[in-house]
Amino acid sequence: MASKGEFAVVDPGDASPIHEYIKNTGFHLKEILITHHHWDHTGGLEELISEYKCSAYGPSGGHIKGITNHLEDNETFHILGDYKFTAFSAPGHTNDQLSYFCKTTSQPILFSGDTLFYGGCGRLFEGTPKDMLFSMDRYKKLPLNTLIYCGHEYTESNLKFANAVEPNNQEILKAIEEVKETRSQNKPSLPSLIDTELKINPFMRCRELTVIQAAEKYSNRKLNETAEVLGVIRNWKDNF
């Protein structure tokens, strides 16, 4: 995000692109947002803090070196002066994962880190299926036109899996073609939309009968809880 000669970055795994951006634009790095502790999201943090004396917002606990502003669930803060964000806990991928939501931009935006991807979700490295379901349900409550900026470009593989779960879902087939065309032009598939995810993302659709039936067929057992469905789908994706 940039405004009036200043900018903020999310999850700088490497400081080099930030240095290059500053060199090319002359903009001042004012703030950094960190979603979770994994190295590919924090690798450039200490170098950038040291070089540019900027603020860094991220999960509380003191386990991420370089964070200057520790955030709790539902805490609000401002970026670049004008943009009001809410940090909310989104466990599953990691226990400390935060997502950042802003509705003071022209269109609502979400920085989802590695919890929610276009067409998928993050691996359960620390959390449980119940944790991830909690996070998916939080995302569902956001405005449908919310732009989702996630941590990785995994969209094509995610949609391939989503199609395996729901082969007759026309929205998934449509998304596959759109993303294929976009990526063929060497453009990012991101951002996605909450509205899109509700139609195509199996981890957002764990209460849909088609997803439940697919999970039961894969696991060869009756699934009585939605978290069980998500857990089976996640295990399926891990081995897909």
Give the positions of each predicted feature:
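Short beta-strand-to-turn element immediately C-terminal to the catalytic PLP-Schiff-base lysine
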Residues: M1-A2, F101-K103, A162
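Active-site HxH/HxHxD metal-binding segment of metal-dependent hydrolases
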Residues: F7, D14-S89, P108, K174, ...
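Residue-level signal for inorganic ion chemistry
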Residues: D11, L48, D114, H152, ...
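Active-site metal-binding loops of divalent metal-dependent hydrolases
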Residues: P12-D14, H37, G61-G62, H93-T94, ...
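Ligand/cofactor pocket segment of small-molecule handling proteins
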Residues: T76, D82-S89, T94-P129
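Active-site-adjacent loop/tail segments of enzyme domains
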Residues: G120-T146
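Accessory terminal helices/loops
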Residues: D137-L147, E156-F240
